Amino acid sequence: MDILLANPRGFCAGVNRAIQIVDRALELFGAPIYVRHEVVHNRHVVEDLRARGAIFVEELDEVPDAATVIFSAHGVPIAVREHAAARGLSVFDATCPLVTKVHMEVKKYSRDGMEMVLIGHAGHPEVEGTMGQVEEGMMYLVSNVSDVATLAPRNPDKLAYITQTTLSMDDTAEVIVALRSRFPLIEGPKKDDICYATQNRQDAVKSLAPDVDILLVVGAPNSSNSSRLAELGTRLGTQTHLIEDAQQLRREWFEGVGKIGISAGASAPESLVQEIMDTLRGWGARVPQEMPGVEEKVTFSLPLALIQAQTRREGA
């Protein structure tokens, strides 16, 4: 069996930044450090940080007074920021800068008196954070083309759309076409809201999937971008499995298989890919082959407040 590795795969700049923020906070302030929601959607990453003293909570009411709290990469509603400020909590924001970009678009449209349509998945923390940037009733959530048909904005001539950053590019394009067809004056962002890492990983799977007999996507089931990769592989007609780690591999999947493709969602560490390859090689697979792909050079700086805290400590 041959193993073909999608490129790029795994951690994106926003995930790297979020994990570094928790790491640095633990180093500077010691445990416990509170994190609102899983900092990224990967059980292995969360368990590692938890073992080092991070405490993951869903609401700020679970955070004691005078504690340090970190907001996850997915972003938070304005009300959460206000709650933290009112309590005087020490906050470091791990919101991905590309999610923050969407929030800034929301604020601009809101200042212009426009209602908004958010293309996204109900219940996802990024969607909750984005919808929480405006008053209730100012933003409508749609997940697919069918949802567009039932939209009833108060003023169809003053409407804008934004998107969750981790969606299927193809599905989102179809929804945007439906929105523009029904609301010809609808405005949208100058640059696509779907993040570069999501686009690159989907493009890599599109290139890889037709050439393999089975595709493994490494990622958590609650990871939006990982789930979209698995859906894409299936849509392209390739037997596809979304797995969290090597323990979820099943030997019978590979009976009669000649080529195995492997990709990984933006919140999946490369160590998990390596463990999966080790297991497959134990079952007779050959040395993995890296496929050509886009080289990602994007990096995001840490929050200024965290950098300043480290500078003060080093100067003490």
Curated annotation (Swiss-Prot):
Pfam families named in the record: LYTB
Where does this protein act, in terms of pathway? Isoprenoid biosynthesis; dimethylallyl diphosphate biosynthesis; dimethylallyl diphosphate from (2E)-4-hydroxy-3-methylbutenyl diphosphate: step 1/1; Isoprenoid biosynthesis; isopentenyl diphosphate biosynthesis via DXP pathway; isopentenyl diphosphate from 1-deoxy-D-xylulose 5-phosphate: step 6/6
- The record's EC number reads 1.17.7.4
Q: Which residues form the active site?
A: E126
- The record lists [4Fe-4S] cluster as bound by C12, C96, C195
The reaction(s) catalysed by this protein are:
isopentenyl diphosphate + 2 oxidized [2Fe-2S]-[ferredoxin] + H2O = (2E)-4-hydroxy-3-methylbut-2-enyl diphosphate + 2 reduced [2Fe-2S]-[ferredoxin] + 2 H(+); dimethylallyl diphosphate + 2 oxidized [2Fe-2S]-[ferredoxin] + H2O = (2E)-4-hydroxy-3-methylbut-2-enyl diphosphate + 2 reduced [2Fe-2S]-[ferredoxin] + 2 H(+)
List the molecular function annotations (GO) for this entry.
Answer: 4 iron, 4 sulfur cluster binding; 4-hydroxy-3-methylbut-2-enyl diphosphate reductase activity; metal ion binding
Q: Which residues bind (2E)-4-hydroxy-3-methylbut-2-enyl diphosphate?
A: H41, H74, H124, T165, S223, S224, N225, S267
This entry's comment on the bound cofactor is: Binds 1 [4Fe-4S] cluster per subunit.
Keyword Signal tagged: no
Identify the residues that bind isopentenyl diphosphate.
Answer: H41, H74, H124, S223, S224, N225, S267
Tell me the residue numbers annotated for binding dimethylallyl diphosphate. H41, H74, H124, S223, S224, N225, S267
- Give yes or no: UniProt keyword Iron-sulfur: yes
CDD domains for the chain: lytB_ispH
Instruction: Set out the biological process GO terms recorded for this chain's protein.
Output: dimethylallyl diphosphate biosynthetic process; isopentenyl diphosphate biosynthetic process, methylerythritol 4-phosphate pathway; terpenoid biosynthetic process
Keywords noted in UniProt: 4Fe-4S, Iron, Iron-sulfur, Isoprene biosynthesis, Metal-binding, Oxidoreductase
Cofactor(s) recorded in Swiss-Prot or TrEMBL: [4Fe-4S] cluster
Q: What does this protein do?
A: Catalyzes the conversion of 1-hydroxy-2-methyl-2-(E)-butenyl 4-diphosphate (HMBPP) into a mixture of isopentenyl diphosphate (IPP) and dimethylallyl diphosphate (DMAPP). Acts in the terminal step of the DOXP/MEP pathway for isoprenoid precursor biosynthesis.
PANTHER family for the chain: 4-HYDROXY-3-METHYLBUT-2-ENYL DIPHOSPHATE REDUCTASE
Q: Which family does it belong to?
A: Belongs to the IspH family.
What this protein is called in its record is 4-hydroxy-3-methylbut-2-enyl diphosphate reductase
Per the UniProt entry, what species is this protein from, by scientific name? Acidithiobacillus ferrooxidans (strain ATCC 23270 / DSM 14882 / CIP 104768 / NCIMB 8455) (Ferrobacillus ferrooxidans (strain ATCC 23270))
Q: What is the lineage of its organism?
A: Bacteria, Pseudomonadati, Pseudomonadota, Acidithiobacillia, Acidithiobacillales
